[in-house]
Amino acid sequence: MKKQWKTATMTVLCAVIAGTTLLSAGCGKKKADNNPQTLEVYIWNAGYGDQWVKPMLETFGNQKWVKEKYPEYKYDVVSNDQQNFGESRINQGENNTIALFFTQSVESFYGTDTLVDLTECVFNQQVPGEDVLYKDKMIDSMRESMVYTPAGEISESYYATPWACNISGFVYNETLFKELNLTVPNTTDELFSMAEKVKTLKNSEYNHTYSIATTAISYMNYLFPVWWAQYEGESEYENYWKGIDSEGVRNSSAVFSQTGRLKTLEIMQKIYTENNGYYDRTSSTYDFMAGQTRMLTRDALMMPCGDWFSNEMKELAQGLKTQGYDDTMRMMKTPIVSAIIEKTPSIKNDAMLSAVISEIDAGKTAPETAGVTQKDFETVRAARGVMYSIGSVHTSAIPAASTAKDLAVDFLRFMATDEANTIYALNTSGGRLPFKFNLKTDAPEAYNELMSTSKETFSMAADCSDYLTDDYASILPYYGKFALARYGGMGMLAGEYPSFESAFISNANLTAKEVFDSTIKYWTENNNARWNRALRNAGLL
């Protein structure tokens, strides 16, 4: 799917990057005219912004096939950061003029006549100009996350498609790491050793004793499934959400006893425990922009976040440079849960585990550390590739009442092209759409253009792009796609302590085992009453 980077597209993008907005005729109108050749688009202006929309709409309109099919093509863009705007407008039915929404999850409309069923008109159609179906070009786990299956049925359909493929993990201040002589941790034990070292440093450049910060949006939640799946393996992680226990028994409440969940809770407890001093407990009171700004002003070394940090913070970062803050932010691969050595008998300790991880990062496909078996090497290699994305809750959908359905469908198909993927990356500081496309190798000229303007400050977008090229890389499917989560109310935690904050901040003396047992009790007490109800609601009983 590699294509030459087109001069015409670059012209549009350069104009946008330079601050010039190119509008097609009629785009200045405040309200669409319900003409089937006018595409009114809504974009939720969050982490990836809205700057990618207009150049993509413009380039779409310049396609020869689009000009022939829609000779009177116009577009209009509505943009805001209101959380529920998309859902409320879709609910207006025929009174809504917006033909295409790029919003948050619209899952509540799946299976209804409110949205266009995209199964045949988008997912099973060929990507324009490319010899591949839309569904096949999409990253597998992202596609799987969009599947709609009614409770108790096996049919699959699609009512929405993702418009982002964000990768989450730890963003860290690379400049500070170097100044403090810190090494990026390969394992969770190394993470905590580093945090202990930071507590003892006497450094005027970083005058805090904690290492990790967060925001009021609990980004820490995005690390939980990664550590969990690292330990259990992706298939066992998915089996939890399917209700299949380690013995292969279906509809089994024994899934709540998965050891990987306990091991991850132990990591969380260690991070949150106040006496350890690893975590800035006040940071959870900051809104996301204020919290992320503290990374730029040297008030935290690292933060659970995502590659959207690049785009979200770029303007603020430029302003902070005038105040002397000019550090480089990077994204590290999530440290591997050290307890994985319980499942790799030839890897005897954390030092050996770290050495194996370094070999994997260097591209090795067989162990060089003495005594390590190929089987254990592959277990760690698979764990190193585990990633988590919330892209599946950034969804695009077409209201069934739209008068421009065909036009909206064609635009969604165009978004899968290499050309559209490139436009998106250049206008989101390296963000990516949910397709099998690598900017670095598929559009190297555009990649170099992006890196020349953004790499000095932000490299996490490039980091994530590189990570996804690893043949062992795997994005976990969104847990909300599983019937037990969607219909049965199943989650990562439950009961008396439904969140990490309620467990380890509000109740500072709780242990990971107590939180773990709380979830088991919630689902199994009274002879599995809640669990059986969840199974019935999910159509599994």
Walk through the language-model features, giving the residues of each:
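Hinge/lid segment of periplasmic solute-binding proteins
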Residues: 106-167, 342-383
